[in-house]
Structure formats: structure tokens, C-alpha cells
Amino acid sequence: MIYTKTGDKGTTSLIGGTRVSKDDIRLDAYGTFDELSAFVAVLGDSEGVEAHEIEVMDRIQNCLLVLESCLALDSQQSTVNSQQSRVPRLTEDDVKFLEDEIDAINAQLEPLKYLIVPGGNILSSRAHVCRTVCRRAERNLVRMGGEYDVDDVLRRFVNRLSDYFFVLSRLFMKQACVAEKPWGSGCSTGQGSTPLGDRLRSL
């Protein structure tokens, strides 16, 4: 059955069986990655995305499911050891995979000289949505890490993932022959400087 009614009072189960409130930071963390996966699906299903990028996003979605499983594991539960052995893990190979993809895309792009304003191409804009949702998911992951153990590999993977969507957004603009919109154009602030742009992008 799709519905169990066990969550009707605002609680749900972690892997291990512990019941927690649905506003628990762990649910907020893995729920945001689930949201991110849905946005990745929208991007991957969009017309004009090339086969290689679709393959990369398929792998990313699988990695996100692994990540969600890790976050849903109750590390404080006494039965966790038996559960833990059956939960897949992200590895350094997954981080390296993203780094290689980032480097390959970045090699095709002009050096970044200013802060970019999203917009101008639907694929690029959808990649920016993925990037910003990923950053929100990362903030939840950091908050979760203040109360529970979070594997450093997960942190690195998520940090690289937002960078991947950033360079992908730029690649889509290049492929569409659309000029990137620099921050400050048409605004009283003036052109965004390179140091400021780099600083804001790295937040």
C-alpha cells in the first residue's frame, strides 16, 4: 500500500526504526536532497540536454539516493550496525567523478570575470535552480552535522555538486550562443568586480 497512516501524527521512521518528528533536522536534510533530485530530473528531461550530461545527471541522482539513505540512518540506534552494513555509501570516487566533470566543462569556458545573474536560457536557468537548491541542502547538512555525525565525503560531494551545476549553467549558455548577464548591468551598483564575484560564488 502507498499509505500506511503511521505518519498521520507528524512522525516518521529513520532507518533503524526510531520514530522522529517530521521536522527533525535529519528529515529536513535528506528531504532537501530529495527535492534536489527532482529538480535534477526536470533538467535532465529538458529538451536540448546532450546525452553525456544526461548520463552524468543519472549518476548524480543515484548518488543523491545513496546520500539520503546515509542521512536517514539513525546512528544513535542500538540496532544500527546491522542496518549500516546494508546501506550503500558515497566514496572518494564519487567526489572525483564530479571534479573531473567540472574540470572538463570548465576547460571549455572563458575565465569568469564577474558575478553572473541567472537567466537568458532555460537550461542554464534550470541548472541554477539545481545549484541553489543544492546550496540549501548543504546548509541543512551542515546544521545536521552540528548534532549528528556526517561523513566528510558527503560534505565534499555536495560542495562539488553545486560547483558542477554552476559550470553546467555556463556551458548551456555557451552552447545556446547566449551572452552571460553580468551582475550590475542596468543597476546603480555598477559592474561587479572580479574579487567580489568570486567571493560571492564561493559562499
Label each PLM-derived region with a short phrase.
Residues 1-203:
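Phosphate/pyrophosphate-binding loop motifs in nucleotide- or prenyl diphosphate-using proteins
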